[in-house]
Structures are given as C-alpha cells and as structure tokens.
Regions:
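Hydrophobic alpha-helical connector segments
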Residues: 64, 78-104, 159-163, 184
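Short hydrophobic/aromatic patch on the recognition helix
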Residues: 45-55
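Amphipathic alpha-helical segments used for helix-helix packing
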Residues: 102-122
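Amphipathic, non-transmembrane alpha-helical scaffold segments
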Residues: 12, 16, 20, 62, ...
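Amphipathic alpha-helical segments enriched in hydrophobic/aromatic and basic residues
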Residues: 8, 27, 32, 36-37, ...
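C-terminal peripheral helix-coil segments that are non-catalytic and often amphipathic
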Residues: 1-3, 100, 136, 140-148, ...
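Amphipathic alpha-helical packing segments from all-alpha helical-bundle domains
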Residues: 71-78, 122-148, 157-161, 172
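Basic, helix-initiating cap at the start of DNA-binding domains
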Residues: 1-30, 35-43, 60
C-alpha cells in the first residue's frame, strides 16, 4: 500500500475511486487492452509507482472497475426491492433500472465484459459472486411474488437469469422491433402471460 503516512481503508478506497473515475474516458476511447498502466497513471495524475500501490496489475484495475459497475446495479436493485410497492411493480422497476443502466453505459459495459473474460480464475470467481448476488436478488422478488400468489410457481433461478440476459438482448440486438423500452414491455408481457393463447 502507499508509502509514508499510513492510509485508512476508507482513504485507500477513495483514492482507488479517484483513479478509476479519471481513467474511464481513456479506457472508453482506447479500449482497456490498448491502455497502459502508464497512461492510466497519467490520466489519474499520479506516478506509475503510486498507481501500482493501489492496483498491482492492470487486471486489478479491470476487476475494480467491473465490480464497481456491478455494485451500482446491485444498489439500485436493492433500493427498489426494499420499497413497499406491489411485487409486479418492483420487478418492472428493477428491470427498467437494469435496462437504463445498460443503455447509458452500452459501450463501456461491452468493453468491460469482453475484457473480463480474459481475467484469471480468481478474478472470474469474484465477478461471478457479484453476478450471482444480483440474480439472487431478482430471484427473491420472483419468490415473493410466488408467496403472494401473484406469480405462478416457476424455477425462479432460471427465470431470474433469463430476465437478466434478456435485458442485454434488448440493448445489443441488431434486429430491434421497437425502442428498448417498448421491447421491454413486450418481453415482460411474454414473461407474465406466456405466448399461449
């Protein structure tokens, strides 16, 4: 960790966030693979050796960035899940928040997702833990709906995964049938009512 006066965990975390925020534009412009640690250090206004104090490797930068993005999504979903509103509205709001996030961060999320696949096993496991937490939260909403008799009994783990993956399809499809928000309405109608007449 940084030399000299010892920093608290809070100060270290704040500095990591500052480095992250100052390097986002650079990563978006050049791509993560084409951005060097020297360039990240320059964008953050720190020396390369100082950068290594906070992030020992470029993979650590990537992991931190991706975990931060997943934490934002998770935090939004947790806030919605805690609201005292009908479970159908809760589900819709969570999916709308995910869709909005993906639309607002489309290029950045695409770049991060491609690079994360190159991480080692430990990094992959950390990312999967975050993804599973989001899936489990959505699964909890579906199970709440089941207990309340709003949703019929289904494989909630599979349903949650399908809904999450569908949000990405709505953003990245090359054959849209409407705006992403319009397609979300269509997809939710299919999820809620099926396709059988």
């Amino acid at each position: 960790m940084p030399k000299g006066i010892p920093l608290t965990e809070e100060e270290i975390d704040r500095r990591r966030h500052e480095i992250f925020h100052s390097s986002v534009a650079l990563i978006l412009k050049q791509g993560f693979a084409n951005t060097s640690m020297q360039e990240i250090a320059e964008a953050a206004g720190v020396g390369k050796s100082t950068l290594y104090d906070y992030f020992p490797t470029k993979d650590h930068v990537l992991l931190f960035v991706f975990e931060e993005e997943l934490d934002i999504l998770q935090g939004q979903a947790e806030d919605i899940a805690a609201q005292d509103i009908p479970v159908e509205e809760k589900l819709l709001k969570i999916l709308e928040a995910q869709l909005e996030y993906l639309l607002n961060n489309k290029n950045f999320f695409t770049e991060l997702s491609m690079q994360v696949m190159q991480l080692g096993q430990t990094g992959q496991q950390r990312i999967m833990k975050k993804r599973y937490a989001y899936q489990d939260l959505l699964r909890g909403v579906l199970e709440q709906g089941g207990r309340e008799g709003v949703f019929r009994p289904v494989n909630t783990r599979l349903a949650a995964r399908a809904m999450i993956e569908t949000m990405e399809v709505l953003v990245y499809t090359t054959r849209p049938t409407g705006t992403p928000r319009e397609m979300l309405g269509d997809v939710l109608d299919m999820f809620m009512h099926g396709i059988k007449s």
